[in-house]
Each structure stands twice: as C-alpha cells, then as structure tokens.
C-alpha cells in the first residue's frame, strides 16, 4: 500500500486550469481584514481547517537555513506554535526543499520528526503544500487528519492553489515589514531612529493623557559623538 504521493505544483495547476474552487465568503472577508502577517496566518490556519475538514492545519515559514518555524496552527496541538522544525529531519522540510506537494497517507510509517509527532497525537495522514512565490518557497501550508489515506489528488490541487494565493499575500506583508524596518531603523546603529522615537513618544503621551499609563525616558550623553557626525554626516545615528 502506498505511503506517499508527490505532486509538482505547476502540474497541479496546469492539469486543473478549468476546475473551480469554492471558498467561504467569511474566509475572504477576514483575510482582507487582516492587518499583520500573523493575523493573515491565523486566519488561513483557521479557515483551511474548516475547508478541508481537517483535524489540524499549520503554517511554517522559513526561519534560517536549518529550520522552518511553525507560525500558526488550528486544531490538534501535535506541533506547537513557534516550534522550530529541522529542515533535514522533517516531512515539511522535504516539501520545502523539493518544492513539491506531498501527501503522507500513513504518518505512522514515517520516521521523520513531524510525522512522529503527528502520530503520537492521533493523526493518521498529512498533506503539505509549498508556499510558492515565483521561484521562491516561503514555507509550507499543512493539513492533517486522523484517518489514513484521507486526502485526494483533487484536494491536493485545491490546497496548492490556495497555497499559491496565500504565498503572494505573505510575500506582500513581508515586504511591508522590511520597508517599515528600513523607515524606522538607523542604518549605522541598527536601533530605532529619531522618526520612530518621536512616534513612540507621541503614542506614549497619548496613552498617558487618555489612560494615565506612565512611561519613562532615559537620556544618555555619548562622548565623542561629533567625530561620528563629522565622518558619516549628521543623519547617521540620528
């Protein structure tokens, strides 16, 4: 009996170009209302769990060359949020590296770390799709069910379609976060710049006036800072 089925994301798309996909209005609504990347991921995890009638849905994103990180999950708590999944020792790691959607029809037959954890929490099968943005894989979108051999090729095509759509949303939020970091961080010191300092001061003052929340400001006098200004300009370190 088969243990795994592997699908190329492009093949799943090209072979199902005319196939419809139906999404709950609530899913699209709350996704559009999401203000942060974490809200996007939490919304996706919750609604994908419903759409695929899964016992667990999770999302991992690239953390570094060795690990993927579980950023959100819904349902079964086999693998907790913030868990670092070793790429070279996990099923999701293979999905990420190979950029292939893979269905493990019986996780109890796998010795990979995440499959072992799923098995220990009563899961029977899992289906993981790469979050593809162009030629780059951002992470994985994963569903699991307590029954073995539960997911179909049709569901694989649907999950990959949603994963491609969500990957674009994730990429946009990551780009916004990078732009916000550049706009609020001093290049020389790597700490918040004057613009961000003033924004925080205004926010804290507003909280103090409206809610009585106290705050403190510490001032440091740095010796020889004029030399830095003379060398790098007055905008540096501001």
What kind of region is each of these model predictions?
Residues 76, 139-150:
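Short beta-strand-to-loop transition segments that serve as allosteric relay/switch motifs
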Residues 1-39, 50, 179:
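Signal-transmission linkers at sensory-effector interfaces
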């Amino acid at each position: 009996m088969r243990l795994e089925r592997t699908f190329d994301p492009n093949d799943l798309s090209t072979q199902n170009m005319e196939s419809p996909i139906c999404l709950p209005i609530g899913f699209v609504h709350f996704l559009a209302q999401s203000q942060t990347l974490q809200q996007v991921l939490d919304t996706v995890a919750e609604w994908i769990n419903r759409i695929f009638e899964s016992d667990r849905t999770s999302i991992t994103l690239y953390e570094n060359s060795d690990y993927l990180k579980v950023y959100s999950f819904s349902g079964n708590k086999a693998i907790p949020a913030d868990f670092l999944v070793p790429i070279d020792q996990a099923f999701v790691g293979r999905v990420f590296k190979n950029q292939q959607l893979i269905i493990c029809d019986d996780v109890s037959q796998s010795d990979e770390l995440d499959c072992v954890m799923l098995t220990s929490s009563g899961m029977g099968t899992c289906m993981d799709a790469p979050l593809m943005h162009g030629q780059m894989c951002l992470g994985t979108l994963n569903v699991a069910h307590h029954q073995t051999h539960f997911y179909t090729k049709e569901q694989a095509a649907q999950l990959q379609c949603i994963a491609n759509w969500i990957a674009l949303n994730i990429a946009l939020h990551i780009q916004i976060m990078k732009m916000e970091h550049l706009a609020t961080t001093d290049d020389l010191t790597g700490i918040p710049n004057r613009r961000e300092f003033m924004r925080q001061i205004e926010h804290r003052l507003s909280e103090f006036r409206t809610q009585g929340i106290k705050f403190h400001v510490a001032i440091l006098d740095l010796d020889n800072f004029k030399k830095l200004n003379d060398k790098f300009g007055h905008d540096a370190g501001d």
